[in-house]
């Protein structure tokens, strides 16, 4: 939503599914004025310290002519208990359309960690200037709420008619604010509409927000609606108010075409004017609830992650008997293939009930005839290529290596097509029961790029994701093309991928990092890809599986 008078409000962020989500609500008090006659137009910019640099992740809307703003735009973040997550809050005056703090617009900042905010729920800190001194008596207050309990979103559309006119030479410029009542009976701003200029019968733009933001997932929680006439000085004229609950809003719009309306009451007029009826009418024209399923909804509903491994055995890896080989089996240090297998597979196996994983090799001559194969079972059992847990994959890899001849070329399409076959059978069920993840470990340039692109485009329409870990120091530019981060991947005939299903990561970027860093990077996109696929097919999660409590046998008599 964008409005030149009320300020710029950015679109809600795209969240990574599967993480805990925290919403931060921000207010400030006693901000420094521009001068004796002019109040600031404040905005708060949130930065997160990540990868050794401060990165902007969110910002509030701009409020005009306000020294003690209460921002309606929530700042949403993913919260990870195992990470420190340092945060900076920069308050600046968005004078003349400024979009970032400058020396002449900077109003102050503060720094803390997300963990500190979450553990205290509410934090009030003084704002500091760039010289480290306090910015007068300016403070910033941050309130944290964890989003939990529901994933419902609400789409609301309001309009009004016959509102009181507050402008002597024109018509009112109405906007509406929505507040929810907190447990301590304080009111929390949850939404502010745009301003509709010069109109006593405004129709505000539809808007969407989470049920948690609207009423803390409590449909009986009181909601307060306040209508104002906008004034550029920041002293908006009060028109009227009314109260409701989300349950009442739902019931009043339950039938198709049904609308709900409230009298907009100014208590001062009601108490003083004998024949006062209302200051206008507000109409709820639309109230729809949208269920947004998460990765955990699907996992808890019975969806299994079917994990398959494909290992590059081409000659470019080097002779395994040499210490310089990428396949060298040193007793002192596991090679990069083994490190990647353990890091990624160790997490994926928790989402597969039988913990049996097909494992294939490509680019090698295999016994007994030593013909080149691009999708052979590394346990040499083509009828049952599955290995017991990741430890079984590693054991099969170690046994396989001395029995094969590394050769070439690096053809990846055959293994993608092989994994796509069961994924296509799964698709035909129309249920969210099994999602395939293929881990490809390779050291070099793909030889069958055209065929691989075609295979990926086909797989993008199936319940399937592909993770490629580049081992060694080769040129991986082709792999980055497959990743699709620079635009949709297309097959040679020009057909685009239905969705981005490939995640490529070079192992060299993580060789000195903890194994968890690699796993976190390569698996980061999988929850989103799972949800995107099933949502695109209109497939809801299964019912949550019932929990079975372990019991202790009674002692024998």
From Swiss-Prot:
PROSITE patterns: C2 (PS50004), VWFA (PS50234)
Cofactor or coenzyme needed: Ca(2+)
Record keyword Cell membrane present: yes
Residues involved in Ca(2+) 1 binding: 167, 173, 229, 231
Transmembrane segments: none
Protein localization: Cytoplasm; Cell membrane; Endosome; Cytoplasmic vesicle, Clathrin-coated vesicle
Major location category of this protein: cytoplasm
Record-level GO cellular component terms: axon; clathrin-coated vesicle; dendrite; endosome; membrane; perikaryon; plasma membrane
Gene3D superfamilies, sorted: C2 domain (2.60.40.150)
Any Gene Ontology biological process: cellular response to calcium ion
Binding annotation for Ca(2+) 2: 167, 229, 231, 237
Occurrences of domain C2 (ranges): 2-127, 134-263
Domain VWFA: 306-526
Subunit structure: Interacts (via second C2 domain) with OS9 (via C-terminus); this interaction occurs in a calcium-dependent manner in vitro. May interact with NECAB1.
Function: Calcium-dependent phospholipid-binding protein that plays a role in calcium-mediated intracellular processes. Binds phospholipid membranes in a calcium-dependent manner. Plays a role in dendrite formation by melanocytes.
Family: Belongs to the copine family.
Protein name: Copine-6
Source species: Pongo abelii
């Amino acid at each position: 939503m964008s409005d030149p008078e009320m300020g710029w409000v950015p679109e809600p962020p795209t969240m990574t599914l599967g993480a805990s989500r925290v919403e931060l609500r921000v207010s400030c008090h006693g901000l420094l004025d521009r001068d004796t006659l002019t109040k600031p137009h404040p905005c708060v910019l949130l930065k997160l310290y990540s990868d050794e640099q401060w990165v902007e992740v969110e910002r509030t809307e701009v409020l005009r002519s306000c020294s003690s703003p209460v921002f309606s735009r929530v700042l949403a973040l993913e919260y990870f208990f195992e990470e420190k997550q340092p945060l900076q809050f920069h308050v600046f005056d968005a004078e003349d359309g400024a979009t970032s703090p400058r020396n002449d617009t900077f109003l102050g900042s503060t720094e803390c960690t997300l963990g500190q905010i979450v553990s205290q729920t509410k934090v009030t800190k003084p704002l500091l200037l760039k010289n480290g001194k306090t910015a007068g008596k300016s403070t910033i207050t941050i309130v944290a709420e964890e989003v939990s309990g529901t994933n419902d979103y609400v789409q609301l559309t309001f309009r009004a008619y016959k509102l009181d006119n507050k402008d002597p030479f024109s018509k009112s410029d109405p906007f509406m604010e929505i507040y929810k009542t907190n447990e301590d009976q304080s009111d929390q701003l949850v939404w502010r509409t745009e301003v509709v200029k010069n109109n006593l019968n405004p129709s505000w733009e539809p808007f969407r927000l989470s049920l948690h933001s609207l009423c803390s997932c409590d449909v009986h929680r009181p909601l307060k609606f306040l209508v104002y006439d906008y004034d550029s000085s920041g002293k908006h004229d009060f028109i009227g108010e009314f109260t409701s609950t989300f349950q009442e809003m739902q019931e009043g719009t339950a039938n198709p075409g049904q609308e709900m309306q409230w009298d907009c009451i100014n208590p001062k007029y009601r108490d003083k004017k004998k024949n006062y009826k209302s200051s206008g009418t507000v109409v709820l024209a639309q109230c729809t609830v949208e269920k947004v399923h998460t990765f955990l909804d699907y996992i808890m509903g019975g969806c299994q992650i079917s994990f398959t491994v494909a290992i590059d055995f081409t000659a470019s890896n080097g002779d395994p008997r040499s210490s310089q080989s990428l396949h060298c089996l040193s007793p002192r240090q596991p090679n990069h293939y083994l490190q990647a297998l353990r890091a990624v597979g160790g997490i994926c196996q928790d989402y597969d009930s039988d913990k049996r994983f097909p494992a294939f090799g490509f680019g090698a001559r295999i016994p007994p005839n030593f013909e080149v194969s691009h999708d052979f079972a590394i346990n040499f059992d083509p009828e049952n290529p599955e290995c017991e847990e990741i430890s079984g994959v590693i054991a099969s890899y170690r046994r396989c290596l001395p029995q094969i001849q590394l050769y070439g070329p690096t053809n990846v399409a055959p293994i993608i097509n092989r994994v796509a076959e069961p994924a296509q059978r799964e698709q035909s069920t129309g249920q969210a029961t099994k999602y395939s993840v293929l881990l490809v470990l390779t050291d070099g340039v793909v030889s069958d790029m055209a065929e691989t692109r075609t295979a990926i485009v086909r797989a993008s329409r199936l319940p399937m994701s592909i993770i490629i870990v580049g081992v060694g120091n080769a040129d991986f530019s082709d792999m980055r093309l497959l990743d699709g981060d620079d635009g949709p991947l297309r097959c040679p005939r020009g057909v685009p991928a239905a969705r981005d299903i490939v995640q490529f990561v070079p192992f060299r970027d993580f060789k000195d990092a903890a194994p968890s860093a690699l796993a976190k990077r390569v698996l980061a996109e999988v929850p989103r890809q799972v949800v995107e696929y099933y949502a695109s097919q209109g497939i809801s999660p299964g019912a949550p599986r019932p929990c079975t409590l372990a019991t202790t046998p009674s002692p024998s008599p």
